[in-house]
């Protein structure tokens, strides 16, 4: 703003459309966003890769150990984070706002994302949201804690992968 002060003049209000908008038919105000904690989780077992035929079964897979660590944080069947300290009660006012927003947007809340779908030999398989209920969808996006893996390290590209037990697995978590 300081760099553009001569062009903008005296700025009294800045609107940032970064948290998403319900639609482009109305102006939306963000009242609820969950916080974020990010970090890198690394499980290192070996100092270098070794032949899997020689080592697997004796040397634990860094990916398996990573899964065990993540299972302490998240129920992999439901996606629910396990530590109670990540959860809070949604205030009544915010719940009422979520209901009002859901009444306006309906299924657009979930349909706005580019879901993958494939014809699997005649039976269609679809990736689906964790809920079809618009109110719950809003609460899951803004109030409920969730775990996302946003990056990975320690994996070769598929075309370069061989019979090697990898020395480590690292995930960027958010």
Where are the language model's segments positioned?
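Contiguous, small/hydrophobic- and glycine-enriched helical/loop subdomains that border
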Residues: 1-14
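Short beta-strand/turn micro-motifs at beta-sheet edges
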Residues: 27-31, 158-163
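Short, solvent-exposed beta-strand/turn "edge" segments of beta-rich domains on protein surfaces
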Residues: 58-59, 159-167
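Acidic-enriched catalytic cores of C-N bond-cleaving enzymes acting on peptides and small amides
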Residues: 6-9, 22, 26, 31, ...
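Acidic, glycine-rich active-site loops and adjacent beta-strand->loop/helix elements
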Residues: 1, 17-22, 45-47
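Short, small-residue-rich loop/turn micro-motifs
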Residues: 37, 42-47
């Amino acid at each position: 703003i300081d760099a553009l002060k001569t062009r903008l003049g005296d700025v009294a209000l800045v609107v940032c459309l970064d948290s998403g908008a319900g639609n482009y038919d109305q102006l939306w105000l963000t009242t609820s966003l969950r916080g974020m904690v990010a970090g890198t989780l690394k499980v290192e077992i070996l100092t270098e890769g070794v032949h899997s035929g020689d080592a697997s079964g004796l040397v634990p897979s860094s990916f398996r150990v990573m899964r065990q660590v993540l299972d302490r944080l998240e129920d992999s069947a439901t996606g629910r984070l396990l530590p109670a300290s990540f959860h809070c009660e949604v205030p009544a006012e915010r719940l009422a706002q979520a209901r009002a927003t859901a009444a306006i947007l309906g299924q657009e809340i979930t349909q706005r994302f580019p879901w993958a779908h494939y014809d699997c030999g005649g039976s269609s398989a679809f990736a689906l949201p964790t809920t079809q209920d618009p109110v719950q969808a809003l609460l899951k996006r803004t109030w409920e804690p969730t775990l996302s893996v946003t990056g990975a390290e320690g994996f070769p590209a598929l075309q370069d992968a061989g019979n090697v037990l990898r020395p480590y697995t690292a995930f960027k978590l958010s």
